[in-house]
């Protein structure tokens, strides 16, 4: 119970502090490595501020929170002290994540990979000691699990500090030789990090809320949901890895002013993410029953989980689009609009669709999985639109023309000049003026054609007979519309 309450908050804090990655990568691209210590210190200060808020919130609100959950006395005791150990977890994370951003960008992602591969072993040893009470330690049960997690993160922080201080490339001594901060670094860290952290929190809270609605379909449906969700989260690590790599690579290329290289990284990231998603989605669908059997011996739960895994295959394909784009946008330090789009996709698309299908169809628990697929699909679509907009803005290219909307005005017809004015100049007033001119010219041309028909003159007979028409009407018309005269428009 304590873990369920804490993990959405923990993921949000990590998302906030990982904003250091694009900031540091762009500095490296601009060859301004001397400014890296300011970013690291800014991240640590922000992290410690979050830790202080979390600590204060725990001591002020823990009693009311646990009372509102109406837990059994034994469960409440474990949850209370498990969450107390999480205070230490947040403290160690607040100092460790900025250092990880530094090693990932200024060093190599293999550094953090090697250190985090040690975490399960370390955590297993601490769990053995504190959960079951071996080696002279008290058997603390669930509280021991929290204590083991806290000590594991403390051990990892020590390893990161050791690596940073020993490496000349990472400049560890410069980081801790001064406490100087710059307000612009703090502000930029928050501008990039807060939307990232909030988007993670909103997404994880939605998934947690869906469990509440699924509870009325019985324990089998809940267990099957957790199986499918756990496997989908495991597979999700592939697009997340691509996203993190793209953040570093794109930010470094943009910092160096090499947009061509940034586009190459973007294409490579999509190829890897989509290729991996197609393989994992195919594997999920083909072996869905076997996957469920790995998690449980209950045939009914495994069967339901197999059905849910089909929907999770849809997630994988959509995530292979939206997640890398989020990494690209973070590399460009564009996170605020992405956060709004994520909220719209999940809380404005996924959640209402899930409730609608649940109340208006007989799909049962499948309603929420279809809603989740719809939400992730909306997220992918909106992320594509945002990326296209940001790319055009960086290139100085105009946005796609919306001049076709003028055709919806009653009695109006669009014209080349109006298209040109809107798409290139964004001058709506000029477009309206040219539309008026176009309408007037059409009326004059219609009257002229009517007179020609009445006089039964063949205007195709000789060039001389139509020369006055060209000079008096058509040339002026074409000059107004396309900027030069052309015989192609002569009737």
Identify the meaning behind each predicted range.
Residues 14-17, 86-104, 112-123, 145-161, ...:
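Short runs within selected transmembrane alpha-helices of multi-pass transporters and secretion channels
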């Amino acid at each position: 119970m304590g873990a369920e309450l804490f993990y959405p908050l923990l993921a949000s804090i990590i998302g906030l502090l990982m904003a250091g990655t694009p900031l540091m990568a762009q500095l490296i691209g601009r060859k301004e490595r001397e400014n890296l210590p300011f970013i690291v210190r800014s991240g640590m200060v922000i992290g410690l501020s979050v830790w202080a808020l979390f600590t204060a919130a725990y001591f002020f609100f823990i009693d009311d929170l646990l009372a509102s959950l109406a837990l059994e006395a034994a469960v409440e005791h474990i949850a209370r002290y498990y969450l107390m150990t999480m205070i230490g977890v947040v403290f160690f994370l607040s100092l460790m994540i900025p250092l990880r951003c530094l090693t990932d960008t200024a060093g190599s992602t293999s550094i953090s990979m090697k250190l985090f591969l040690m975490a399960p072993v370390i955590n297993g040893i601490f769990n053995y000691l504190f959960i079951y009470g071996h080696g002279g330690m008290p058997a603390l049960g669930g509280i021991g699990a929290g204590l083991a997690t806290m000590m594991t993160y403390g051990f990892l922080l020590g390893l990161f500090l050791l690596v940073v201080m020993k490496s000349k490339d990472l400049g560890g001594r410069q980081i801790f030789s001064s406490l100087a901060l710059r307000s612009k670094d703090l502000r930029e860290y928050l501008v990039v990090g807060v939307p990232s952290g909030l988007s993670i929190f909103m997404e994880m809270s939605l998934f947690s809320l869906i469990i509440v609605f699924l509870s009325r379909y019985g324990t089998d449906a809940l267990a099957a949901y957790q199986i499918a969700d756990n496997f989908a989260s495991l597979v999700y690590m592939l697009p997340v890895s691509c996203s993190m790599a793209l953040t570093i690579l794109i930010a470094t290329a943009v910092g160096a002013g090499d947009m061509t290289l940034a586009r190459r990284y973007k294409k490579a990231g999509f190829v890897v993410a989509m290729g991996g998603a197609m393989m994992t989605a195919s594997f999920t669908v083909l072996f869905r029953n076997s996957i469920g059997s790995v998690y449980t011996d209950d045939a009914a739960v495994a069967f339901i989980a197999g059905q849910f895994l089909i929907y999770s295959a849809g997630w994988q394909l959509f995530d292979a689009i939206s997640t890398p784009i989020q990494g690209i946008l973070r590399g460009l330090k564009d996170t605020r609009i992405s956060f709004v789009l994520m909220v719209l996709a999940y809380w404005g698309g996924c959640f209402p669709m899930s409730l609608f299908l649940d109340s208006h169809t007989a799909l049962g628990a499948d309603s929420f999985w279809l809603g989740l697929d719809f939400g992730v699909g909306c997220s992918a679509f909106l992320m594509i639109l945002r990326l296209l907009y940001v790319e055009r803005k960086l290139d100085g290219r105009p946005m796609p023309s919306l001049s076709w909307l003028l055709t919806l005005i009653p009695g109006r017809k669009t014209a080349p000049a109006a298209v040109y004015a809107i798409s290139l100049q964004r001058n709506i007033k000029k477009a309206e003026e040219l539309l008026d001119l176009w309408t007037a010219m059409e009326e004059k041309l219609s009257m002229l054609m009517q007179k020609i028909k009445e006089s039964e003159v063949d205007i195709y007979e000789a060039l001389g007979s139509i020369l006055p028409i060209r000079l008096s009407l058509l040339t002026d018309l074409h000059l107004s519309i396309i900027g030069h005269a052309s015989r192609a428009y002569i009737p």
